[in-house]
């Protein structure tokens, strides 16, 4: 079951698309950081799929602070890392407050700009026990005046699974290799998968120009076991994030 809900973050209403497993009361959670178009049909589908796999899945609308006008790049350009961190934290706290549920470990995945968000959060909050980065661009660029996600690599607290298309320009394979080397440098557990016949947004089935069925299926089929290995169901009480 999946539906829209709404919370308030820093005085601004933020919508969330929430997928709830149909069985049980105790389960891990996965935050789904959306791609440039926002929480659209593709992101909703990923939330629903994760819920069917037994995860409480939540996709927050990271654009909630800004007006809807502007193209994708303009809207991405308005995002600020401190605000994004606050939004993701609010989504985790929302999961922890849900009635009749017992929350286990929390992971995060993201696509395109959301892949960058997943990398950022892996370094920003130790609450996350796993991060899935799907063709995350601009990991080496800041949103605002703070450090880049790349600069924060020493503070990463969880294993990362990355999925990248060899034909992508952002991130390019050179970018991917540089990020992997940085993770190696700081001995951060990661597995990176590169697909030679895919470019950016190769999982997005709503875009025939970029979708690649084979790589998309393979990447998702690798993500689910990764989450199963890293996220556990727990009955221990959790503290609210600040």
Name every feature range the model reports, one short phrase each.
Residues 99-111:
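Alpha/beta-hydrolase fold nucleophile elbow
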Residues 4-101, 148-149, 202-207:
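Serine-hydrolase catalytic machinery in alpha/beta-hydrolase-like enzymes
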Residues 110-114, 118:
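Gly/Ala-rich beta-loop-alpha elbow adjacent to hydrolase catalytic centers
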Residues 127-138:
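A conserved short beta-strand
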Residues 184-242:
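C-terminal catalytic histidine-bearing segment of alpha/beta-hydrolase fold enzymes
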Residues 169-175:
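Conserved alpha/beta-hydrolase "acid-adjacent" motif
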Residues 156, 162-164:
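Short beta-strand/loop motif that positions the catalytic acidic residue
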Residues 108-110, 134, 163:
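Short beta-strand immediately N-terminal to the catalytic nucleophile in serine-hydrolase-like folds
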């Amino acid at each position: 079951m999946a539906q829209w809900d709404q919370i308030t973050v820093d005085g601004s209403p933020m919508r969330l698309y929430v997928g709830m497993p149909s069985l049980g009361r105790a389960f891990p959670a996965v935050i789904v950081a959306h791609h440039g178009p926002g929480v659209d049909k593709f992101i909703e589908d990923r939330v629903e799929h994760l819920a069917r796999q037994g995860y409480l899945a939540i996709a927050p609308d990271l654009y909630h602070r800004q007006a809807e006008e502007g193209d994708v790049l303009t809207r991405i350009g308005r995002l600020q890392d401190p605000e994004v961190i606050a939004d993701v934290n609010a989504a985790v706290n929302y999961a922890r407050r849900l009635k009749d549920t017992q929350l286990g470990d929390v992971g995060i995945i993201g696509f395109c700009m959301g892949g960058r968000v997943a990398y950022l959060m892996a370094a920003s909050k130790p609450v996350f026990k796993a991060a899935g980065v799907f063709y995350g661009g601009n990991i080496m660029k800041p949103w605002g005046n703070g450090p880049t996600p790349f600069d924060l690599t020493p503070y990463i607290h969880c294993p990362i699974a990355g999925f990248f298309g060899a034909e992508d320009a952002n991130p390019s394979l050179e970018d991917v290799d540089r990020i992997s080397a940085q993770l190696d440098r700081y001995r951060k557990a990661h597995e990176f998968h590169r697909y030679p016949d895919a470019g950016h947004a190769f999982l997005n089935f709503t875009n025939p120009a970029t979708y690649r069925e084979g790589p998309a299926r393979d990447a998702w089929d690798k993500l689910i076991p990764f989450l199963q290995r890293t996220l556990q169901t727990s009955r221990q009480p959790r503290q609210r994030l600040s």
